[in-house]
Amino acid sequence: MSPKQHGTVTASCRCGAVVLEVTGAPIVHAACYCTSCQEAGRRIEQRPGAPSVLDADGGTDFVVYRKDRVRCVRGGERLEALRLKPESPTRRLVAACCNSAMFLDFTKGHWLTLYRARVPEPVPPLEMRVMTANRREGVMLPQDAPNYPAHSGRFMWKLLLAWAAMGFRAPKFEGAQAYDIRR
């Protein structure tokens, strides 16, 4: 990993009105094929002018960071939260200005999952694909990274190590007033 990846980078929406500041190396770079990510991706892509969320194979490419290392420095008032169900602890934040999917926030967790398209280069190579048992029928996955049918022990171990480094805290994401949307 290059030194720049351990520094501070900015992640922004397509039009640049929403900007996140990200410090430090990512926890993991993964693609998810769960039914929730696929459904959320379809919903976000239906918004006017929205950039693609789902890859051609139906996966969602994510770069996961510690929640205490990501903050919104501009445009937080433009973020809208999409929840697949009203009671869901998982929300996907979308920049309403250009309908760019920004990140997924599991509100009970200690990490933020940034959509790969929002993270500037260089990004570490894809480390794994998870939840591949839910991929679309007929999709053949390349063997360039491990393909796990569910969440892998390796994925969970990386999250646990990050949580331990945070003193087992699960902070709230600060710097954004995200209004829930029901679409």
Role assignments for model-derived ranges:
Residues M1-S12, V18-R183:
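A short Gly-Trp-Pro
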